[in-house]
Amino acid sequence: MRIKNGVWARKRHKKWLKLAKGYWGAKSRVFKQAHIAVMRSLRYAYIGRRLKKRDFRRLWITRINAAARQNGLSYSKFINGLKKAGISLNRKVLADMAINDQKAFAELVEIAKKQING
């Protein structure tokens, strides 16, 4: 008797079609197109997880730069002054301070200015 792969093939197809749920047109119903669409979306998701880190760092730097310039210092000089002062806060925390705690951020800018000017 010839053994076929019907049950397992159907399970495999259902798995991919389940991942393609919500896709438009045949991409959610036809296995071959659904499989291609899901593979592409997984690839974009993988790439996106790496781009997200870059995008957030860029956003934090932009926010820090804007807040530092309001207090009379450029971003690069501000970071240099903090390094010289021995203050090691990451950019995520600095950006949060720039938005939510402007007084504390202004104090950090003053500390950085003192370190730069000597």
UniProtKB/Swiss-Prot annotation:
The keyword rRNA processing does not apply. GO terms for molecular function: rRNA binding; structural constituent of ribosome. GO terms for biological process: ribosomal large subunit assembly; translation. CDD domains: Ribosomal_L20. It holds the Pfam family Ribosomal_L20. GO terms for cellular component: ribonucleoprotein complex; ribosome. InterPro entries: Ribosomal_bL20, RIBOSOMAL_L20_CS, Ribosomal_protein_bL20_C. Keywords: Ribonucleoprotein, Ribosomal protein, RNA-binding, rRNA-binding. Binds directly to 23S ribosomal RNA and is necessary for the in vitro assembly process of the 50S ribosomal subunit. It is not involved in the protein synthesizing functions of that subunit. Belongs to the bacterial ribosomal protein bL20 family. This is Large ribosomal subunit protein bL20. It comes from Caldicellulosiruptor saccharolyticus (strain ATCC 43494 / DSM 8903 / Tp8T 6331).
